[in-house]
Structure formats: C-alpha cells, structure tokens
C-alpha cells in the first residue's frame, strides 16, 4: 500500500527501502515514483518472474539484491544492482544460511583473484562464460579490486550482536536486521546493541558487554525443519 510508505517517510528521517517482487518491474516503477530511497528486489516476496530479474539499469533509484554465491552476485550487478546482500533465510533467527552465502561469495572471489594472479586467463574466460554467466569485464574488475565492485551486506537470520560481528569479520560491509530485532523481547535495546557490535565488530570485549541484558531473543528456526518448497533463499537465479 503506497499510503503506508508515505506514512513511514513522513515519520522518519532515515532512508526508506521498499521491497519489489523479483522480476516485477512495474512494482519497482511505482516504488520509484513515490520516492523510496532504495528498492529491494526481494526473494522474500513471491517472484513475479521465475526467469528474469528486473533490469535495474532502467531506473534511477538504487537496487539491492540477494545472492547465494559469486555468480548470483555478479549477475545482479550486471543488471544494475547498487548493493548486494546475502539471501540468508529471512525470519528464521538462524544465521547459518547467511554464513554459507558469504563464504561462497568469498571463495568465488578468491578463485577469480587466484586465476588472474597466475595469469590463467583462459580459466577466467571459461569461468565467466560457463559458471558465472557474466561479461568478462566484471570478472576483471573483481580480480583487480579483490572484492565485489559494490557493497555487500549480510541479511537473513541475524538476531544477536555476535551474529552481526560474525558477518562483519567475514568481510561484509554492513548488515540488515529485521525480525531479529522486532520479534525479540526488547527491540530498542537489541537494535542499539547490534549497531554497536557492527561498528566494533573486532572488539569481543565490547560485543560481550553490549550483549548483556538484551531480553529474550527471537526464537530461532532450524533450517532443516523448513520444507524445501518453502525456502526463500532459493528464489532467483
């Protein structure tokens, strides 16, 4: 409901991000027209297109997209995404999928950098064409930067200050936290603690201190207990 977005924009001074279904470019057009600061092409919503994502280069509003591995990340960047995030498994309070996705992206980057530094250009071309399915120019940019060419945030299952610090130490540029805060016993205190842990991710003493007396955490869900067809992170290509 656009009215809800207008109400939120009027109530806060921080940037407002709204979700559009994967491939639903008209939803994205509407969100851009009402002035959201960023659009999340999100697997949390039922996809509108099972084959194609939104051509994000056709918009002026920046997009964030989820990725489980380097191929998904680079394909979204090639489409125009300004930010990447792990897909995680939203609403579970279980960080295991976000960790898995970040490790996969890091391992993919390490392979690209390794091939490039060893002069194995033929392997890079094959990787770009057959595995990652992106133009060679993006691969070379990753090899040069030794990271993604856009910021990469963690999302999905982050519920504690230690979770946030874990993802930052793994190389994330920041974190998204939703239900891990709002479904906890004391959202305001937990939110502040997660912010502190994100800023001070390499200071375990401080993380331990801000983790005290946060109230009841969101109840975590074991990923193995979720039926295969209900997993959100598998949506998108």
Curated annotation (Swiss-Prot):
<feature type="active site" description="Schiff-base intermediate with D-ribose 5-phosphate">
    <location>
        <position position="19"/>
    </location>
</feature>
<comment type="pathway">
    <text>Cofactor biosynthesis; pyridoxal 5'-phosphate biosynthesis.</text>
</comment>
<dbReference type="Pfam" id="PF01680">
    <property type="entry name" value="SOR_SNZ"/>
</dbReference>
<keyword id="KW-0663">Pyridoxal phosphate</keyword>
<protein>
    <recommendedName>
        <fullName>Pyridoxal 5'-phosphate synthase subunit PdxS</fullName>
        <ecNumber>4.3.3.6</ecNumber>
    </recommendedName>
</protein>
<keyword id="KW-0456">Lyase</keyword>
<dbReference type="InterPro" id="IPR013785">
    <property type="entry name" value="Aldolase_TIM"/>
</dbReference>
<comment type="subunit">
    <text>In the presence of PdxT, forms a dodecamer of heterodimers.</text>
</comment>
<feature type="binding site">
    <location>
        <begin position="178"/>
        <end position="179"/>
    </location>
    <ligand>
        <name>D-ribose 5-phosphate</name>
    </ligand>
</feature>
<dbReference type="GO" id="GO:0042823">
    <property type="term" value="P:pyridoxal phosphate biosynthetic process"/>
</dbReference>
<keyword id="KW-0704">Schiff base</keyword>
<feature type="binding site">
    <location>
        <position position="157"/>
    </location>
    <ligand>
        <name>D-ribose 5-phosphate</name>
    </ligand>
</feature>
<feature type="binding site">
    <location>
        <position position="91"/>
    </location>
    <ligand>
        <name>D-ribose 5-phosphate</name>
    </ligand>
</feature>
<dbReference type="GO" id="GO:0008615">
    <property type="term" value="P:pyridoxine biosynthetic process"/>
</dbReference>
<dbReference type="InterPro" id="IPR001852">
    <property type="entry name" value="PdxS/SNZ"/>
</dbReference>
<dbReference type="InterPro" id="IPR011060">
    <property type="entry name" value="RibuloseP-bd_barrel"/>
</dbReference>
<feature type="binding site">
    <location>
        <position position="103"/>
    </location>
    <ligand>
        <name>D-glyceraldehyde 3-phosphate</name>
    </ligand>
</feature>
<comment type="function">
    <text>Catalyzes the formation of pyridoxal 5'-phosphate from ribose 5-phosphate (RBP), glyceraldehyde 3-phosphate (G3P) and ammonia. The ammonia is provided by the PdxT subunit. Can also use ribulose 5-phosphate and dihydroxyacetone phosphate as substrates, resulting from enzyme-catalyzed isomerization of RBP and G3P, respectively.</text>
</comment>
<dbReference type="GO" id="GO:0036381">
    <property type="term" value="F:pyridoxal 5'-phosphate synthase (glutamine hydrolysing) activity"/>
</dbReference>
<comment type="similarity">
    <text>Belongs to the PdxS/SNZ family.</text>
</comment>
<dbReference type="InterPro" id="IPR033755">
    <property type="entry name" value="PdxS/SNZ_N"/>
</dbReference>
<dbReference type="GO" id="GO:0006520">
    <property type="term" value="P:amino acid metabolic process"/>
</dbReference>
């Amino acid at each position: 409901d656009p009215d809800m977005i207008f109400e939120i924009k009027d109530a806060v001074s921080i940037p407002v991000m709204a979700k559009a279904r994967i491939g639903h470019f008209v939803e994205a057009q509407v969100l851009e027209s009402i002035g959201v600061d960023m659009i999340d092409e999100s697997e949390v919503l039922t996809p509108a297109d099972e084959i194609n994502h939104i051509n994000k280069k056709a918009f002026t509003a920046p997009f964030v997209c989820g990725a489980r591995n380097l191929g998904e990340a680079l394909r979204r960047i090639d489409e125009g995404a300004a930010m990447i995030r792990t897909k995680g498994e939203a609403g579970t309070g279980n960080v295991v999928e976000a960790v898995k996705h970040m490790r996969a992206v890091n391992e993919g980057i390490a392979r690209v950098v390794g091939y490039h530094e060893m002069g194995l250009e033929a392997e890079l071309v094959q990787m770009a064409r057959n595995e990652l399915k992106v133009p060679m120019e993006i691969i070379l940019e990753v090899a040069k930067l030794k990271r993604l060419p856009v910021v990469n945030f963690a999302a999905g299952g982050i519920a504690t200050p230690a979770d946030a610090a874990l993802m930052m130490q793994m190389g994330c540029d920041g974190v998204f936290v939703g239900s891990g805060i709002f479904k906890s016993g004391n959202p305001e205190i937990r939110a502040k603690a997660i912010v502190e842990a994100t800023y001070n991710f390499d200071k375990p003493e401080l993380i331990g201190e801000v983790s005290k007396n946060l109230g009841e955490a969101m109840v975590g869900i074991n990923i193995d207990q979720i039926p295969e067809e209900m997993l959100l992170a598998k949506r998108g290509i």
